[in-house]
Amino acid sequence: MPATQQMSRLVDSPDGVRIAVYHEGNPDGPTVVLVHGFPDSHVLWDGVVPLLAERFRIVRYDNRGVGRSSVPKPISAYTMAHFADDFDAVIGELSPGEPVHVLAHDWGSVGVWEYLRRPGASDRVASFTSVSGPSQDHLVNYVYGGLRRPWRPRTFLRAISQTLRLSYMALFSVPVVAPLLLRVALSSAAVRRNMVGDIPVDQIHHSETLARDAAHSVKTYPANYFRSFSSSRRGRAIPIVDVPVQLIVNSQDPYVRPYGYDQTARWVPRLWRRDIKAGHFSPMSHPQVMAAAVHDFADLADGKQPSRALLRAQVGRPRGYFGDTLVSVTGAGSGIGRETALAFAREGAEIVISDIDEATVKDTAAEIAARGGIAYPYVLDVSDAEAVEAFAERVSAEHGVPDIVVNNAGIGQAGRFLDTPAEQFDRVLAVNLGGVVNGCRAFGQRLVERGTGGHIVNVSSMAAYAPLQSLSAYCTSKAATYMFSDCLRAELDAAGVGLTTICPGVIDTNIVATTGFHAPGTDEEKIDGRRGQIDKMFALRSYGPDKVADAIVSAVKKKKPIRPVAPEAYALYGISRVLPQALRSTARLRVI
């Protein structure tokens, strides 16, 4: 059924406070309740609602003291117990016969945690997605537990840090002064803008009554802050939450740090956790992540196969390091690409492999399958931008957006620049540089739009910083890849997408056999002889592509920005930084 327009009503809470409730979306769909925190209103969810409206019946409401809801005067009317009463009243009237899915932020989330402590809550709540609003019991136990163990410096210092990050609540608890200052401050457009950080203006959702709402609802702080330290339950006295819960943990939240959630699993046996690179107001900055999390949880409740993202997020579930992870590797028919695909498969990943040679990429897929892995082979010319975009579209539709993208495909070219045909020089740039650019554009955009991070690996070479006159096309393409990766890394960092540049040294692959040699005036026999000498040198080096693959896997785990591979690659990398003139002199060396 088509989504309906927003409708509103007032619901009475047990203490007589009237709660303004808004409902919209699919009237025949499952109900999802969206609960906001401070200083927001139901408007906080304006970016999320369109992503849920087709499937869900959406219920959201203004907390007491906010918007069209009543404004009780006593501070005691703003305890989390009252917030839980409000939530109970809303779902009791709007969804009396069916359990609801819940997405809640900040104090709204804390109030839902309070509700889940109550008997029978698991019959009313089908799932709970919590954003930047931990249970008071859980967080206080984390802090007290750390402070009691000064002999564990890391735990002790984290507990102190978390306590200090919440100390602003004491200031917000000062009567008269706090409401007045908030009303004045939030009347300023500049303050409202700075409060949410660098979120694009069109994604900022504040009500017109934000300043007034904040002045009224700031009573939430004196009603709960000091009380939480004295009345929170401890250890085994904390009730077990028998509801599926997923935490969306914002790594840049200045108030509740990621480690503040580390003990949640003690009291929530069915727990999922998604860490994203976002600040406190992630419902505005990452609405697609909020919506995807709700959809995934609803699918799970419906008995559908959980998504890879949900499987990865499940706390306590045994899996390989890259289990439930999708990895794309280009140039996977042989050499470094093939070994990289095999290495990630050993770590539990599903692999999307591509190569311009259909026979070799299918052989790699068969090898992965024979070892118990899963691989999806594709034929791809990475130099064709349209083909790469179509490939990315198809892969994303059939398997999902890859979590890790390895742009490896490359070719060699030997010969002096003036001896190399223009089309051959351009082909090297098109594959070695263009292939990387095309892959980053196609998949990088999708990773950013998805909003949950990821990792890109661009395979360059030590040739990026070790020039050779007989490898001008190859060195140029790899140096450009190196610099392009440095630039893109800084751009993608804001979205939580990592980027590693791999710089292999002399690696024993088939690249020499497939490299074009151009030396006018030299007969083919001499060229073949020289090719054989170089090939033998690579073989005697005995440094195989499997070692590069292991380095790639390790670099992704450790989030390394640059990773030379092989001793000579490390040595030349260091020399390029300390004695660049020494390396420039090596450019005089000739391969042929």
From Swiss-Prot:
EC id: 1.-.-.-
Natural source organism: Mycobacterium tuberculosis (strain ATCC 25618 / H37Rv)
GO MF term list: oxidoreductase activity
Protein name (Swiss-Prot/TrEMBL): Probable oxidoreductase EphD
Family (UniProt): Belongs to the short-chain dehydrogenases/reductases (SDR) family.
Enzyme class: oxidoreductase
CDD domains named in the record: SDR_c
Annotated PANTHER family: OXIDOREDUCTASE EPHD-RELATED, RETINOL DEHYDROGENASE-RELATED
GO cellular component terms given for this protein: cytosol; peptidoglycan-based cell wall; plasma membrane
Gene name tied to this protein: ephD
